[in-house]
Amino acid sequence: GHVVVVGGGPGGLEAARAAAGRGHRVTVLDRADHLGGTARFSSLTTPMNGELVRWLSTAVAEAGADVQTGTTATAETVAALEPTAVVVATGAVRTRPDVPGANLPHVLSGDDLRGLLTGEDLGARRPGRLIRLVLAAGRLLGITDNLGRVRALSRRWMPIGRRVVIVGGGLVGTELAEFF
């Protein structure tokens, strides 16, 4: 059969690898230009996550899956592939904390920050024009494609204010604190 996997993060890549290993024809669709999802971004502070993404990406390619990055999956695009099965692995849904001010323009979620730093969503929380221009230039020049460069540059400059409060002391919050 033909398995279509929507989402190129670790869950989607593992589903694709497993399906291809069982003899299925596999197509992976991911709207981002790079595989890995949040794990790829988190490799900025936790390089092992990047190793996992590289391993899964290589395993999926070696298994013969058709990987289509920069492709938004819609009902029409998926149906056109005539799959016998569809796996939706689009990642976790995170919500903003229900606290006063959480929706103010200068308040960023981890997803907002990822969108800014990778250039994937420059309108995430409406940063100033200069910041959007700098980040757009970085994306056009390919700077945001290389997480090593993003890591090095983020040590010198972040597209947010000088005073930062991080809400949450779990893994993501502590990883994020390494930027500041």
Where are these regions (language model features)?
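NAD(P)-binding Rossmann-fold cofactor-contacting core
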Residues: R31-A39
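Short, hinge-like loop/turn segments at secondary-structure boundaries
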Residues: L44-M48, P105, R126
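Short acidic, glycine/serine/threonine-rich loops at helix termini
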Residues: A39-F41, D98-G101
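N-terminal Rossmann-like dinucleotide/flavin-binding domain of flavoprotein oxidoreductases
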Residues: A39-P83
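Rossmann-like dinucleotide/flavin-binding elements
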Residues: G1-A32, Q68-E82, A89-V99, D112-F180
